[in-house]
């Protein structure tokens, strides 16, 4: 497949790009700063005309959108959050209407507040924060494109990345873990594999991409400690 990964320098984007390249796909990446591991286009999604040119100029089979602004940064920058998390996914989908190109949009399980559950694809999206709501608005639901809702863990090439694994690897001494906070997410590698399979099977609509069993964040941190810190 001819694949374009938008936001290739993020925690998800870099793993997805490398996975698809290693599987033999023709991968082009789009990022604000250089991504040296694949063919790379440097640009900014806020430059709308250039961004649309990147999407339209090559007849890609698959575009994976990993662009977004996260958590407290979304709350602190509401206009940027609406543009990147809500508007850009629909702009891409609208632009691709007359192309065969499929869009896979990355959403989040944060569209649900987590106060009830279990949550299904058609459950009411009751996320409370500005980030939660902008991501909910950015979900694409049609019979061509695909939205994956998920929570992810994995390595980050950005030393300032805010992911749980990156945070854990920078900690020293005793740290706290939540025994009642359940996590049902997947690794970024599993996400990349799921995206490849979904594209091959032409999956469309919205799917909650979750693990087949949950784990507390405390137990997840214990696994990190066992396999990456040798039970320090």
Task: Describe the residue ranges of each PLM region.
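N-terminal Rossmann NAD(P)H-binding glycine-rich loop of SDR-like oxidoreductase domains
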Residues: 3-23
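Rossmann-fold cofactor-recognition segment
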Residues: 32-48
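NAD(P)H-binding glycine-rich loop region in Rossmannoid oxidoreductase-like domains
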Residues: 45-84
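Conserved catalytic-site region of short-chain dehydrogenase/reductase
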Residues: 72, 105-118, 130-131, 153-158
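Glycine-rich NAD(P)-binding loop of the Rossmann-fold in SDR/ketoreductase-type enzymes
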Residues: 76, 80-91, 125, 133-134
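Conserved Rossmann-fold NAD(P)-dependent oxidoreductase catalytic core, especially the SDR/UDP-sugar
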Residues: 90-126
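NAD(P)-dependent short-chain dehydrogenase/reductase
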Residues: 128-130, 140-190, 196
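Mid/C-terminal beta-alpha module of Rossmann-like enzyme folds, strongest
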Residues: 192-232
């Amino acid at each position: 497949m001819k694949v374009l990964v938008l936001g290739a320098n993020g925690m998800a984007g870099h793993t997805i790009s490398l996975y698809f390249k290693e599987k033999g796909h023709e991968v082009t990446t789009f990022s604000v700063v250089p991504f040296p591991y694949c063919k790379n286009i440097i640009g900014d999604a806020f430059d709308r005309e250039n961004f649309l040119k990147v999407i339209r100029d090559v007849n890609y089979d698959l575009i994976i959108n990993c662009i977004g602004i996260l958590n407290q940064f979304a709350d602190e920058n509401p206009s940027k959050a609406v543009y990147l998390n809500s508007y850009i996914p629909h702009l891409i989908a609208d632009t691709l209407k007359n192309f065969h190109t499929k869009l896979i949009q990355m959403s989040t399980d944060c569209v649900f507040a987590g106060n009830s559950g279990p949550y299904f694809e058609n459950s009411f999206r009751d996320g409370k924060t500005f980030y939660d709501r902008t991501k909910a608005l950015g979900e694409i639901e049609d019979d061509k494109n695909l939205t994956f809702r998920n929570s992810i863990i994995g390595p980050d090439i950005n030393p300032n990345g805010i992911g749980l694994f990156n945070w854990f690897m920078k900690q020293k001494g005793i740290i706290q873990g939540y025994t009642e906070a359940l996590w049902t997410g997947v690794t970024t590698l599993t996400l990349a594999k799921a995206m490849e399979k979904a594209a091959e099977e032409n999956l469309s609509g919205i799917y909650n991409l979750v693990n087949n069993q949950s784990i507390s964040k405390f137990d997840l941190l214990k696994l990190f400690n066992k396999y990456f810190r040798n039970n320090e």
